[in-house]
Amino acid sequence: MELFLTGVVLKPKGLKGELKVKPVTDFPESFLTRREYYIGKTPEDAVLRKVQSARFHQGFAWLVFEGAGSREGAEALVGCGLYVTRDALVAMPDDRAYIHELIGLDVFDETEGRVGKISDVLQMPAHDVYEVDTGDRKVLIPAVEDFITETDLEKGMVRLKRFKEFL
């Protein structure tokens, strides 16, 4: 089963097992409606836990899980990731994509043809940056309209302009 990270447990609050969670999703409001998460240090060791209560405050989700209703139970989850299955992911608008959908896409230049594959997506404050593996080296390309002319998930490709400027 493939799991996707949506949040990271930062610290407990109080004596009743409430956890401060940093969302790592474009849809933080989903923490208010999702009733279960897989929790673990890695996706491989994550176990399914039901949400007892949820609230959102100052950019963080505050969750209480069944079976972790004490401070000690909450402290055991600090540093763990909160994961969901593919079918539990929020649907993206047509002009957006999840990072896992972008990694592995073939990258084409308007004049040179295929130049490599996206090997990673770096999330920067201003915009994402695609790491393109050309085979010889890795090149960082800002994921903005000035450089990305087309992204087609169905065809498995991204088209760039002015790629040589990054070499």
From Swiss-Prot:
> Which Pfam families did the record assign?
PRC_RimM (PF24986), RimM (PF01782)
Q: Name one GO biological process term.
A: ribosomal small subunit biogenesis
Report the main location listed first in the record.
cytoplasm
Domain annotation text?
The PRC barrel domain binds ribosomal protein uS19.
Arranged from A to Z, the UniProt key words for this protein are:
Chaperone, Cytoplasm, Ribosome biogenesis, rRNA processing
Which gene specifies this protein's sequence? rimM
- What this protein is called in its record is Ribosome maturation factor RimM
Q: Where is the PRC barrel domain?
A: 94-166
Family per record: Belongs to the RimM family.
Q: What molecular function does GO assign, one term?
A: ribosome binding
Q: What does this protein do?
A: An accessory protein needed during the final step in the assembly of 30S ribosomal subunit, possibly for assembly of the head region. Essential for efficient processing of 16S rRNA. May be needed both before and after RbfA during the maturation of 16S rRNA. It has affinity for free ribosomal 30S subunits but not for 70S ribosomes.
The terms describing its cellular component in GO are: cytoplasm; ribosome
Assembly, in brief, is: Binds ribosomal protein uS19.
